[in-house]
C-alpha cells in the first residue's frame, strides 16, 4: 500500500473512532478542513508538524502514530 493511502486510512480511522469531524480536527491542530480532507483522500502527505500535532491530539507518541501507519504498509 502506498504511504499516502496508509496515512489517509490511519488518520480517518483515528478521527472517526474518536467521533471528531475533519473541521474540529483541523481547528485543534491549527490547520484547515480542506487540508485534512486532502490527506484523508490520499492527495496530500502531511507535514511533520501536522503529523506531530495530530499525534498529540489523539494522545499518541510520534512512534505510536508511525507504527499505526506502518502496519498498513
Predicted regions and their residues:
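A short, Lys/Arg-rich alpha-helix, primarily the initiator
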Residues: 1-17
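Residues that mark the N-terminal boundary/hinge immediately upstream of a DNA-recognition element
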Residues: 10, 21, 47-50, 61
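Alpha-helical residues within the helix-turn-helix
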Residues: 16, 27, 56
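Short alpha-helical DNA-recognition segment
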Residues: 19-38
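Short, conserved catalytic or interaction motifs in soluble domains
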Residues: 41, 60
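Short, basic-rich loop-to-helix N-cap that marks the start of a DNA-contacting helix
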Residues: 43-56
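Short, charged recognition helix plus adjacent turn
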Residues: 56, 64-73
